[in-house]
Amino acid sequence: MAQECKVPLVHIEAGLRSYNDEMPEEHNRIESDHIAKWLFTPTQQATENLKREGFKGRVIEQVGDVMLDALQMFQSSAVYTEKMGPISFFHKPFALATMHRFENISSPERLAFLVDQLNTFNDTVMPVWMPLHPATAVRLKEFGLNLTVHVAPPVGYLEMLWALKQAALVLTDSGGLQKEAYYSDKPSVTLRGETEWVELIQMGASVLYDPSENQPLAPIALNMLSSFKPGTKAPYGDGKASQKIIHALGLA
């Protein structure tokens, strides 16, 4: 739309690559990089991706992750609400789970496998709390699948931050929640075969879990729990990405 209206485009989170051509977000990222005038990258790897792909005549600036800015700004405002379920549930160790990626919910077989793994983890390792994405809820009903974990309706950002603060572990296919778990010093299992946030895997802050390999989830998650060591926030900037973008655009 910006290109059609001849409005200069700024791409925040430029240069990220998962190298999964079947993921719609991957196509959107690459297309946005090609039409944007300003490319603001969150990481050194993202910057190198753009340079390797031959982007020229654009402003490329590494600023860090705007999601770190947001978390630092709003973490103190995190809040529990009754729709999340009984507050007593959150007083014991639990795993926070989310799932919404097209590749995970579009296939009946793949979704059934993930549901089985989450149910088993809930029954044998620790309770799982899962705010259910509307698209996932539709697919579960369509495929006749039953989640026996502790399901909640969709929650807002401040509620999610509160739950994240209480959680012992995160199980997610969300790129954003992977990082928020890391920023909150929580280990995570990424329910995908790849991630654009490769630094999390390299640092041992998260581990990939590819459902197509049909491996049990529990051993991988338990190993992540035992091996995780909270790290620094350096790979994703200093929490001032938004300020750097404003200054670069001459809006300060």
Each language-model region and where it sits:
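Nucleotide-activated sugar donor-binding and catalytic core shared by glycosyltransferases
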Residues: 1-126, 135-252
